[in-house]
């Protein structure tokens, strides 16, 4: 078995990118990134992500990892990185915003009524960010296995 646990445990702490890629609707965004010695994060194609570096601890520095961001944990009011909107799906009171971060596809799930931003449409370039109320997920780029907080703080 790839992972054993309650649905909530599997959702909140997927053991691998494989599990993360199908748990949740839509599933977690998986973004290959590299982290330099100062804790600065950039995508494989060199786009800087201004995610607070206090969340990037020593064990992750100077490594290539995968950053996992849940679609509902991305804020349209954030200012950490820029994406190009490819398509917007309206699903009742929610919208799914399909974007490109460089060459990486990501999906944002946003409540239509709770956001203070103006509506977005295909072709728009917008600035977004990781909602700091929620944890970031880190995975080993080679094995796909989750990098646990216990491993990080050890």
Where does each model-flagged region fall?
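Internal alpha/beta loop-helix hairpins
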Residues: 1-49
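Non-catalytic connector elements of ABC transporters
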Residues: 26-30, 38-154
């Amino acid at each position: 078995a790839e992972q054993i646990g309650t649905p909530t445990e599997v959702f909140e702490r997927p053991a691998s990118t494989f599990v993360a890629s199908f748990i949740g609707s839509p599933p977690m965004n998986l973004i290959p990134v590299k982290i330099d010695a100062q804790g600065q994060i950039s995508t494989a194609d060199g786009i800087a992500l201004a995610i607070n570096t206090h969340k990037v601890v020593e064990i992750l520095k100077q490594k290539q990892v995968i950053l996992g961001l849940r679609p509902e944990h991305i804020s349209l009011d954030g200012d950490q990185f820029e994406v190009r909107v490819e398509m917007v799906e309206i699903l009742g009171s929610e919208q799914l915003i399909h974007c490109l971060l460089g060459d990486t596809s990501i999906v944002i799930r946003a409540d239509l009524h709770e956001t203070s931003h103006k509506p977005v449409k295909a072709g728009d370039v917008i600035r977004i960010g990781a909602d700091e109320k929620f944890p970031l997920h880190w995975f080993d780029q080679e094995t796909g296995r989750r990098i646990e907080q216990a491993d990080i703080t050890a």
